[in-house]
């Protein structure tokens, strides 16, 4: 069996780290053996770097078999003589990152497929400081894991590892919650007496967000809070479609807002007081303006190339810079550190703020948004209306298209090698192939065409002054490449 495995994996590796870690279908690619191959490859890396004396934090989400995958990973690391801090309950990914940073660990792991469909699970790897592992780490890690056979994996009985002190449970949730409470104006939130509806989307944010908001004396109602490994039949990703139940609850209860997080709580979704879904782009703009205007912070902003250029307008108005990076939050956090940026984020719902962790955190972002509403004394809808009055409006559309591997190869060659692009019928300022293909038009509109790093999809984003103009750009791309 071992020789067959080695032959198979040499021809067709089953582990691939993309922009959001490694994700695969449970029992197809995401198996006990493959997970333990990643753990063994990580253990070998830790030992070769001479940091085996530092513990590794492992956490997990609410998905099917996530606790078991976490224990199986811990077994391998412990068998290699590495101490594992296993978080004692399903935990938000940002809490796992925070724990890696707080305990001074060299590495950490999260068993999660984030916002992917329920049939998936995955692994995210973190490095010192609680940062997403960069491609210089994940590529050698995946290559090493794919080269391993079953007999190359070291194992130890869990009872033996625990008795030897190699595996211990970690109860860091209270510390993480306290760190967020210490970073916001709890007194202002208490005085506002806000009614908030939470939607953890059957994920891991319930305990943290409930505790934070109830400590700040918010009136909190929660839906979709139990564990459901099928996520209620929905994609655990906040969007206008998946948050309709939350919107209904906000309107029915007369709440100030609804807050949702994705499956592992690193992404945020918000419903305003009118029941409208606030796009992550709008949340980023709101918080950047709030940090600059209300909190008196100074500094640039970082966004990925598929995120609104409204951030550029806010930055220019305050004499600041807006830096553009490829998709993948590790690029955002790296550029933030390089330029001492005060906020960074992406249109898919992830953001972080200077002084917190170097990764996206839906729990922290949601709490900061509550502070903003409390201190400004206005509804979210009114606050964003003020933004539009000041900076104008940009509309963004995102569409996804499936493909066969043959069709993907054709599109890669046509777009990225031959640079064969539609005419578009408007002035093109320049084209970038930094990550996929981005066309910048002279009127400040743009379009991005790129393959997802986490799902088998081709994504097309367009932003323009009006929805109709953005849709027109999308339609030209779809027609030219025959995507529909």
Positions of predicted regions on the chain:
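N-terminal small/polar loop signature for handling phosphorylated ligands or for N-terminal nucleophile
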Residues: 44, 52-120, 211-271
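Buried hydrophobic positions in well-ordered alpha/beta secondary-structure cores of metabolic enzymes
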Residues: 20, 58, 96, 109, ...
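Phosphate-binding and adjacent anionic-ligand microenvironments
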Residues: 256-257, 297-463, 467-484
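An N-terminal, well-structured beta->alpha segment
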Residues: 1-80, 106-107, 163-196
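Proline/glycine-rich low-complexity loops and linkers
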Residues: 88, 95, 143-176, 273-345, ...
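Gly/Ser/Thr-rich active-site loops/lids in small-molecule metabolic enzymes
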Residues: 134, 222-224, 276-295, 362-370
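Short beta-strand-to-turn element immediately C-terminal to the catalytic PLP-Schiff-base lysine
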Residues: 125-128, 269-273, 353-354
């Amino acid at each position: 069996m071992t020789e067959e495995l080695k032959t198979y994996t040499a021809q067709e590796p089953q582990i691939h780290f993309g922009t959001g870690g490694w994700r695969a279908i449970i029992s197809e690619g995401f198996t006990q053996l493959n997970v333990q191959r990643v753990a063994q490859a990580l253990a070998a890396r830790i030992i070769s770097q001479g940091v085996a004396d530092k513990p590794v934090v492992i956490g997990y989400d609410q998905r099917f078999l996530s606790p078991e995958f976490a224990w199986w990973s811990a077994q391998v690391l412990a068998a290699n003589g590495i101490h594992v801090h296993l978080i004692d309950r399903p935990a938000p990914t940002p809490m796992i990152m925070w724990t890696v940073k707080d305990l001074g660990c060299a590495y950490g792991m999260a068993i999660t497929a984030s916002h992917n469909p329920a049939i998936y699970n995955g692994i995210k790897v973190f490095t010192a400081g609680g940062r997403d592992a960069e491609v210089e780490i994940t590529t050698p890690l995946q290559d090493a894991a794919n080269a391993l056979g079953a007999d190359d994996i070291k194992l130890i009985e869990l009872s033996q590892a625990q008795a030897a002190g190699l595996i211990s449970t970690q109860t860091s949730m209270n510390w993480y919650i306290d760190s967020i409470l210490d970073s916001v104006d709890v007194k202002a939130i208490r005085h506002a007496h806000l009614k908030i509806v939470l939607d953890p989307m059957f994920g891991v944010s319930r305990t943290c967000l409930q505790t934070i908001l109830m400590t700040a004396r918010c009136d909190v109602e929660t839906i979709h809070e139990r564990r459901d490994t099928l996520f209620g039949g929905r994609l655990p990703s906040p969007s206008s479609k998946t948050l309709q139940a939350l919107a209904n609850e906000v309107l029915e209860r007369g709440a100030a807002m609804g807050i949702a997080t994705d499956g592992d709580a690193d992404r945020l979704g918000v419903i305003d007081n009118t029941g409208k879904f606030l796009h992550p782009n709008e949340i980023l703009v709101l918080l950047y303006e709030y940090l600059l205007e209300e909190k008196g912070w100074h500094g640039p902003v970082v966004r990925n190339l598929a995120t609104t250029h409204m951030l550029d307008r806010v930055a220019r108005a305050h004499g600041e810079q807006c830096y553009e990076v490829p998709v993948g939050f590790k690029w955002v956090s790296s550029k933030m550190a390089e330029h001492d940026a005060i906020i960074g984020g992406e249109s898919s719902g992830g953001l972080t703020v200077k002084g917190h962790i170097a990764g996206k955190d839906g729990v922290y972002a949601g709490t900061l948004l509550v502070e903003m509403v409390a201190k400004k004394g206005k509804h979210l809808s009114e606050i964003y209306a003020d933004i539009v009055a000041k900076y104008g409006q940009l509309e963004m559309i995102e569409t996804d298209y499936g493909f066969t591997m043959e069709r993907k190869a054709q599109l890669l060659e046509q777009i990225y090698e031959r640079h064969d692009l539609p005419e578009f019928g408007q002035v093109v300022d320049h084209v970038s192939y930094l990550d996929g293909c981005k066309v910048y038009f002279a009127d400040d509109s743009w379009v991005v065409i790129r393959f997802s790093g986490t799902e088998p999809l081709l994504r097309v984003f367009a932003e323009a002054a009006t929805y109709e103009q953005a849709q027109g750009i999308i339609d030209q791309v779809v027609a030219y490449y025959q995507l529909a």
